């Protein structure tokens, strides 16, 4: 049977991964600003003599004076543009009109990478997934009988509150607002301006509604609509004086004040309600109408008699994405409201003082500046851009969160809200999500998914026939309800055997109405365009992940985001082909904007001579610190005089090679136990990984100090620091700043600073009184507040910046010192593969002790074989074997996952054929042995003997993660204690002590250290008197005395029991020891 799949010859390419951020910001700039300026009201004074007005259609933005690249690394600059709006002030009595274009504030600009630069720091706004505004129906069943007792309709507003309509078993309809107590629906209808006659004429079931009204009137005793408003306020918000709503005008004002702000549906909510209830209300009517409530009551009655459908609240058609445009437009609206209040107060104040207001005296930029500063600095969904490596940056910009204001909370979110729904396929990745309490609440966008102008997720599908399936202009974009009407083939292509009978019907797997079924190919209307269409950017680079358990694929995708850039980047031998797009869209790779000839190239810039005779000068990033303290650096990939085409690579980033992500290394690994040192995910490595800088990474730490004017005088930056040894000041210049290029150690001063001391404070110091009394000498009037290198912070100073904020009236000076560190891999560092196989370096072996191959090559890393079968991540075996073949053949493989759709065991056949080819072409027949395919005999480096069993070896792409022992190792002899329990504080940042928990107790018990364990749990921990004595006893070499009192934790327990009215009385433990009641 011949099937023509070429009738639609559209070429599908990967979309720009920054698209969702950039398009949303463009929508805010082009539409959102104008919409809010058009809604800005006319402002009048109390005498209605002056009128102020803004004209939104003529606004304009000024291009920022600082370039995008410069603002990112200047620590106080925000990348923004100035907003100017025409304004008019009318003086009605005199007929004077003044018009002026006013500056109302700065709008933060999004960079070309989809990020915002706020105070020199790259930030990103996470998209939020919320329940879409509209109406949703659900039912509640009796737990005993199983029958439906209540039908609930929930009307969700855009930014306001929720209204619930409940039809109970007694045919009574109630409503409630935001989980407050329920009130009769008749109150709501009468308060909205309806009467009984109009209600009965509008509904489709007047008999049922008549009974509801009659019972409600008997109970509520409501006769007229003004009384209904008063009763409504009284029952929902407390008591209300009825005289306040006696007049019709006040009634109308209260009705407007009550309904419009609380039930603003927005255009999306209006669209959903019209679609669900089959209404013809104009889309510009964005507030809840009485007609909507009556139609909702009708639909509830229909559900009672078996007509209509309930809604699945977890379906993506009932959810929308609140993007950057929505957040910024909402904040801009809030800023304009604050500006309107400010203008109103100022115009009234000036008219009361008999002064003539001017436009300049009324308008200020403070409301807009403060509102956006508050949003970017404190809003939960405005986050630091994760810049650990290029792949991390792309993933962070494509993330969704169900948390945040208006969303779910991670503590009470149900399993159903976190679970995978059939509607997410092709739109949200079912694998990549956070681990822990945020699992299922934070997810990533699939690679071909997009967001429409309503905020709904779409997926790209291929039409099989020339039928009109979608009304949208883009004929290949299917919205979230497409699977409700069409059969969608889940295979990207259809493989047909040439021996098949032409008349035989061919079946394929398809998706229809949230179900997966087998159907005839002739009934297929749509099909997916790629087998990777279901997954996100973080999952797609994992080779052979179809052979992994989903939990391990999740861990692998998360750990790829934690990989640090290495000293010498190396791209993976085995990949999936998606790597180049991720690297280019991350912004770490420099791409040629036009074709031309390389006219000049060095480590800092590249000049391209284009065809028209002009030049394009591109500055490169050199040793810049990222938000995660990793190094951002770009290296030229072109030579002088080379001719380039548009789109070719000019420079690679710190973690890219050849335009592909290169955050790891192709390491020769062996899966075997080795003396127990790789037990429980521990990893053994060869010392050559240290000497050859294979896993050496570069980190840049930023240290900050502020010099300001205090009450006792200005702080001084100087090299002359009293009472400090000259050795610690050896790197300072005459201004007290460290010299760039200096190698500094722990304790060295990098910024010398003296702070004035209060004269009275100087005399309080004992030596001050002594010097004053004997010699008449005043102690130094300053104290040393230098910035010193902290423990573990040694390195080379690469930059020193002194910054004076322009808008600061406190004359502050900020000094930033950047120190570069080269960190070699060491015991305690965390490494991982791309399949969730992670471990900690437990031992570094000499290269002569490592097992070696039959050609003499020593193994570079030994992994535990027990970590594969129980975790079910077999993809790592396919990767390392294919990587071994590629290493010998000098080839790189790009294998799209799910290759089993072509034939059974396709992955295994590919690996074995490449291993066999490598063995034949390199004269190493041991690479593929028929008796043990994929395994080889290894030789013990210590004895020279062959191991008894063949061992799986290969080249795996291993990553060095940002969880490094240099950042975690910590020790203290004594330090701060908790005031309540008197136990050491927790954490390195607080100078905390070792927390002896359950596993630590087991470790000490395993070594038989019973006395050490007893001391750590008692007297060294929370016994105040005993821990002071034990220091002297240890120094003097004397035995440790047994304490005579109880530890503080036992006293705390006794006090807590007393709070529960349980008193511990005297108890004789021994004849010579009685617990004293007073001590408790």
Curated annotation (Swiss-Prot):
Belongs to the RNA polymerase beta chain family. In plastids the minimal PEP RNA polymerase catalytic core is composed of four subunits: alpha, beta, beta', and beta''. When a (nuclear-encoded) sigma factor is associated with the core the holoenzyme is formed, which can initiate transcription. This is DNA-directed RNA polymerase subunit beta. GO terms for molecular function: DNA binding; DNA-directed RNA polymerase activity; ribonucleoside binding. It comes from Huperzia lucidula (Shining clubmoss). The keyword Nucleotidyltransferase applies. Transmembrane segments: none annotated. Its EC number is 2.7.7.6. The lineage of its organism: Eukaryota, Viridiplantae, Streptophyta, Embryophyta, Tracheophyta. Keywords: Chloroplast, DNA-directed RNA polymerase, Nucleotidyltransferase, Plastid, Transcription, Transferase. DNA-dependent RNA polymerase catalyzes the transcription of DNA into RNA using the four ribonucleoside triphosphates as substrates. It is found in: Plastid, Chloroplast. One of its GO terms (biological process) is DNA-templated transcription.
């Amino acid at each position: 049977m011949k099937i023509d799949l070429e009738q639609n010859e559209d070429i599908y390419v990967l979309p720009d991964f920054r698209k969702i951020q950039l398009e949303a910001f463009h929508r805010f700039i082009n539409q959102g600003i104008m919409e809010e300026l058009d809604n800005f009201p006319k402002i009048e004074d109390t005498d209605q003599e002056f009128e102020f007005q803004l004209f939104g259609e003529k606004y304009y933005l000024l291009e920022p004076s600082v370039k995008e690249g410069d603002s990112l690394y200047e620590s106080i600059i925000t990348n923004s543009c100035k907003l100017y709006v025409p304004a008019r002030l009318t003086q009605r009595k005199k007929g004077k009109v003044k018009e002026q274009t006013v500056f109302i504030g700065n709008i933060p600009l999004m960079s070309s990478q989809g990020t915002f630069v706020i105070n020199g720091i790259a930030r990103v706004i996470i998209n939020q997934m919320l329940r879409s505004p509209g109406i949703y129906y659900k039912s509640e069943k009796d737990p005993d009988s199983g029958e439906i007792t209540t039908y609930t309709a929930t009307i969700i507003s855009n930014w306001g509150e929720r209204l619930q309509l409940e039809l109970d078993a007694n045919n009574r309809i109630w409503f409630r607002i935001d989980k407050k107590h329920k009130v009769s629906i008749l109150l709501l209808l009468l308060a909205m301006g309806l009467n009984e006659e109009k209600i009965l004429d509008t509904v489709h079931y007047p008999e049922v509604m008549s009974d509801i009204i009659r019972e409600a009137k008997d109970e509520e005793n409501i006769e007229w609509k003004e009384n209904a408003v008063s009763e409504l306020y009284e029952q929902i918000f407390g008591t209300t004086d009825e005289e306040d709503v006696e007049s019709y005008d006040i009634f109308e004002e209260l009705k407007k004040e009550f309904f419009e702000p609380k039930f603003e549906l927005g255009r999306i909510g209006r669209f959903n309600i019209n679609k669900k209830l089959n209404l013809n209300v104009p889309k510009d009517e964005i507030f809840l109408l009485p007609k909507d409530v009556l139609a909702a009551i009708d639909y509830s009655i229909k559900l009672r008699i078996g007509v209509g459908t309930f809604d699945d609240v977890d379906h993506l058609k009932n959810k929308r994405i609140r993007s950057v445009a929505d957040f910024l437009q909402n904040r801009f609206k809030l800023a304009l409201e604050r500006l309107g209040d400010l203008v109103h107060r100022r115009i009234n104040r000036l008219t009361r003082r008999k002064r003539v207001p001017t436009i300049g005296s009324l308008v200020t930029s403070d409301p807009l500046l403060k509102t956006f500063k508050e949003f970017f600095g404190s809003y939960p969904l405005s986050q630091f851009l994760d810049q650990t490596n290029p792949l991390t940056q792309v993933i962070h910009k494509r993330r969704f969160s169900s948390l945040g204001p208006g969303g779910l909370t991670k503590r009470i979110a149900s399993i159903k809200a976190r679970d995978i729904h059939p509607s997410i396929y092709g739109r949200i990745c079912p694998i990549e999500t956070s681990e822990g309490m945020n699992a299922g609440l934070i997810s990533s966008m699939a690679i071909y998914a997009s967001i429409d102008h309503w905020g709904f997720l779409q997926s790209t599908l291929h039409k099989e026939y020339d039928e009109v399936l979608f009304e949208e202009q883009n004929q290949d974009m299917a919205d979230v309800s497409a699977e409700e009407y069409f059969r969608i083939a889940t295979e990207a292509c259809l493989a047909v055997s040439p021996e098949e009978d032409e008349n035989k019907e061919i079946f394929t797997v398809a998706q229809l109405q949230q179900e997966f079924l087998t159907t005839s190919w002739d009934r297929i209307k749509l099909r997916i365009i790629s087998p990777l269409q279901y997954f996100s950017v973080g999952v797609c680079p994992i080779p052979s992940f179809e052979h992994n358990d989903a939990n391990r694929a999740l861990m692998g995708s998360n750990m790829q985001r934690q990989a640090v850039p290495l000293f010498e980047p190396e791209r993976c031998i085995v990949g999936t082909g998606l790597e180049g797009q991720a690297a280019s869209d991350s912004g770490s790779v420099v791409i040629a904007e036009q074709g031309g000839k390389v006219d000049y190239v060095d480590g800092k810039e590249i000049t391209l001579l284009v065809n028209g005779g002009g030049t394009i000068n591109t500055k490169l990033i050199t040793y810049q610190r990222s938000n995660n303290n990793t190094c951002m650096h770009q290296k030229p990939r072109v030579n002088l005089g080379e001719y380039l085409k548009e789109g070719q690579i000019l420079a690679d980033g710190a973690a890219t090679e050849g335009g592909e992500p290169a955050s790891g290394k192709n390491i020769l690994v062996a899966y075997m136990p080795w003396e127990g040192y790789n037990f429980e995910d521990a990893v053994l490595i060869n010392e050559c990984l240290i000497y050859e800088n294979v896993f050496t990474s570069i980190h840049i730490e930023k240290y900050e100090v502020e010099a300001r004017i205090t009450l006792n005088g200005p702080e001084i930056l100087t090299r002359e620091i009293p009472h400090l040894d000259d050795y610690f000041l050896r790197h300072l210049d005459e201004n007290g700043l460290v010299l760039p290029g200096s190698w500094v150690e722990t304790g060295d001063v990098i910024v010398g600073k003296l702070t004035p001391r209060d004269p009275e404070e100087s005399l309080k110091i004992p030596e001050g009184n002594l010097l004053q009394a004997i010699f008449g000498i005043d102690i130094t009037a300053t104290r040393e507040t230098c910035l010193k290198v902290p423990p573990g912070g040694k390195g080379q100073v690469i930059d020193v910046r002194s910054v004076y904020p322009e808008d600061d009236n406190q004359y502050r000076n900020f000094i930033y010192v950047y120190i570069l560190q080269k960190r070699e891999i060491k015991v305690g560092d965390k490494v991982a593969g791309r399949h969730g196989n992670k471990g900690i370096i437990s031992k570094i072996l000499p290269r002569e002790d490592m097992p070696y191959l039959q050609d003499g090559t020593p193994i570079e890393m030994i992994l535990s074989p027990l970590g594969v079968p129980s975790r079910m991540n077999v993809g790592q075996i396919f990767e390392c074997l294919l990587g071994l073949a590629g290493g010998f053949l000098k080839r790189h493989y790009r294998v799209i996952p799910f290759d089993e759709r072509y034939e059974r065991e396709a992955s295994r056949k590919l690996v074995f054929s490449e291993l066999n080819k490598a063995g034949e072409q390199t004269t190493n027949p041991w690479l593929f042995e028929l008796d043990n395919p994929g395994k080889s005999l290894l030789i013990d480096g210590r004895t020279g003997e062959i191991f008894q069993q063949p061992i799986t070896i290969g080249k795996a792409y291993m990553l060095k993660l940002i969880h490094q022992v240099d950042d975690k190792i910590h020790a203290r002899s004594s330090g701060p204690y908790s005031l309540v329990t008197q136990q050491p504080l927790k954490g390195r940042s607080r100078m905390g002590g070792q927390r002896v928990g359950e596993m630590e107790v087991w470790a000490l018990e395993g070594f038989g250290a019973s006395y050490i364990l007893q001391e750590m749990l008692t007297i060294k921990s929370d016994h105040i008197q005993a821990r002071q004595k034990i220091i002297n006893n240890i120094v003097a070499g004397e035995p440790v005395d047994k304490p005579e009192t109880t530890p503080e934790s036992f006293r705390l327990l006794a006090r807590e029991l007393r709070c529960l009215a349980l008193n511990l009385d005297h108890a004789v433990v021994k004849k010579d020891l009685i617990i004293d009641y007073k001590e408790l």
